[in-house]
Amino acid sequence: MPKARVLSLLLNTGHALDHLFLLIFATAVSAIAAEWGMVWQDLMPYTVGAFVLFGLGSLPAGRLGDLWGRRAMMVIFFLGLGAAGLLVASAQRPWQLAVALTIMGAFASIYHPVGIPMIVQNSTRPGFTIGLNGLAGNLGIAVAAVLTGFLVQRTGWRMAFAVPALLAVLCGVLFALVVPREEMAPARKPRRGVELPASVMMRIFFVMTLAAVSGSMIFNFTTNGNSQLLAERLRGLVDDPARLGLLLALAYTVASFAQIVVGKLIDRYPLKAVYLPIVAAQVPLFLLASSAQGWVFYALVLAFMVFVFGAIPFIDAMIVRYVDDRMRSRVAGMRLAVSFGVSALAVYLLGPTVKAAGFTTLLLVMAAISAATTLFVSLLPGRVPAPSAAAAPAASATAS
């Protein structure tokens, strides 16, 4: 297999593992709570450190990716994530669990500002490449639901962390052995890419940050809450945790393919024309889901997750289209630090909010957040001014 394909395979696997690790806890939390004599809602705040560092850790990770090298950072990502997973599996007290999850979040923060710029840096179809990479990440979410449910039921919650941890270590070893060293760090390469007016760039980054924050909150609310939400709304119809995990995995798998379609559209049309209807469609679906039960609710979960996952490629597409490769990891790191740092609040509030007000209120809140995202995206310029003549040839390799 050519080295470029091996690199792509390992980077896409890394994205899957990144999301898988962050969501094992959301599926296993009921089993952990039962073992420790607690309720799952009271355990959810213990994972907030993981999501805070998942965001804040993006700043140093992005800086090191540009200035030191992306290959070395990806090796650290795989090996560190695996070690952290084994640490979670060995936790004996809630505080130990919180510390181990926080360490896991720190290593997980490396992937997005480093792995995604690495996989698109030589791509002639960045939208499709981002869509395929996003599909891999969301399949990791699907696998988290079904694999965790299976392992929890058969072998206990600790193995649900240990098995993916060993896979991550294996990927790290393969990455170190197979992927060649970079000739120079990205920050030292010659400049290539579009040059846009400062006012346009400020507007794009303003919208990108706001949309990233609200979109990340929706992503965290859904992916961390869907497992318990499905258990509540399908009670009496499906009560087996493994079957619930399978249903959730099916929904995530189907929804994940939306990113391939969206990626192809991004390569052909202005970002705003594709992004706006996708976020707008989330609003009525969350409103309908708030009062639905049974299989109707499951159909709505499938529908709204198509649009939640379909919205994921846009922020990365903005960075690829408008930011030179020399500083993409740093820009991505800054964006991720803000959006994931703020959206970590969603994880912290999930348990207490559901305990106090129920899932109906949560779904209504998500509808309001999606409406805000729609407003933010509407502020994007319809068409971006053409790049300067000097930048155009180089830009064709990175912009659709």
Question: What are the residue ranges of the model-derived segments?
Answer:
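Extracytoplasmic gate region of multi-pass secondary transporters
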Residues: F25-A26, R203-F257
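Conserved MFS/SLC helix-loop-helix module at the cytosolic interface between two early adjacent transmembrane helices
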Residues: L56-Q92, I266
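Helix-loop-helix hairpin linking two adjacent transmembrane segments in secondary transporters
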Residues: N133-P180
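C-terminal transmembrane helical hairpin of 12-TM major facilitator-type secondary transporters
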Residues: R268-I315
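A late C-terminal transmembrane helix in Major Facilitator Superfamily
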Residues: Y322, R326-A357
